[in-house]
C-alpha cells in the first residue's frame, strides 16, 4: 500500500451521496473485523482502495466524480458489463458521459473489468461500491458473490430492500442498522464480507 499523509479518522465533515464520516468509519471498522461502535478517533495512514461495479452507468459515473481526489478513497478498479470489459473507461463510455463536470483524467485510461469476473475485480480493492443495472435477483446474487470473497459491498441498489439481514442505512437516521451485519456474515459464511 502506498503511504499518504496521516489523517484523523473520522474527520468532522460529510462527503455527499448520503454518507457521513461516522458511517464510513463504521464500514472501515467492520471491514477490519473490529467492533462497529467506537468512541476514539483512528489515524488513517493509507487510502482505502475501492472499485465501482456498474461504472459505466449514470450512478457509476456519479461515483467516479465523487471519488476523484477523495481524501480517504483511492479508485483503483472499474467494472461493468462484458460489452465494456477490456476497453478503456473513455472508450466504454463513448459519448455517454452524463455528468456536468468532464470525465476525470485519472479514469480515462483505466481498463474496465467484467463485473461477472468477481475474483479479478476484487484482487486490488478493500471494498466496492455497487451501481450495477440488472434485474434485482441478479443484483442480489452478484453482490453476495462479492461479499463471499470477503469484500464489503456498499450498494446503491434497492435489490436487497427486503433481505432481512442487509441494512438499508441512512447514516444520520439509522446508523445502528449496521448491527445486523454479523447475522448476514453468518448466513454468507464470511468474516469481513457483507452487503
Model-derived features: where do they sit?
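Low-complexity, intrinsically disordered or signal/transmembrane-proximal segments
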Residues: 6, 37-38
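Generic N-terminal simple sequence motifs
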Residues: 6-7, 31, 100
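N-terminal Rossmann-like NAD(P) cofactor-binding subdomain of oxidoreductases
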Residues: 39-195
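Short Gly/Ser/Thr- and charged-rich N-terminal loops/segments
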Residues: 16-17, 24, 31-33
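Charged/polar low-complexity intrinsically disordered segments
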Residues: 2-3, 26, 41
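Short terminal hydrophobic/aromatic SLiMs and anchors at protein ends
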Residues: 12, 26-29, 38
